[in-house]
Amino acid sequence: ERRAERESQMRADEEFGSQVQYLTQQRRARLPWRREGRSFDEEFRELRNVDEEERRDMMIE
């Protein structure tokens, strides 16, 4: 049972990781000049900020 739990957690982590990767690629496609020399953490923080901005924009509309 515990192994199944661990496996589903791993699957969830993988899924989340590939989502972040996908979003990062999308983001980079939009902002090619920001790509060089950025750490994953910076990318991720910026992705989160963009999500929050987009949510705010949706609320305003």
Curated annotation (Swiss-Prot):
One of its GO terms (molecular function) is nutrient reservoir activity. The keyword NAD does not apply. One of its GO terms (biological process) is negative regulation of translation. This is a 2S seed storage protein. Inhibits cell-free protein synthesis. Belongs to the 2S seed storage albumins family. IC(50) of translation-inhibiting activity is 17 uM (small chain) and 300 nM (large chain). This is 2S seed storage albumin protein.
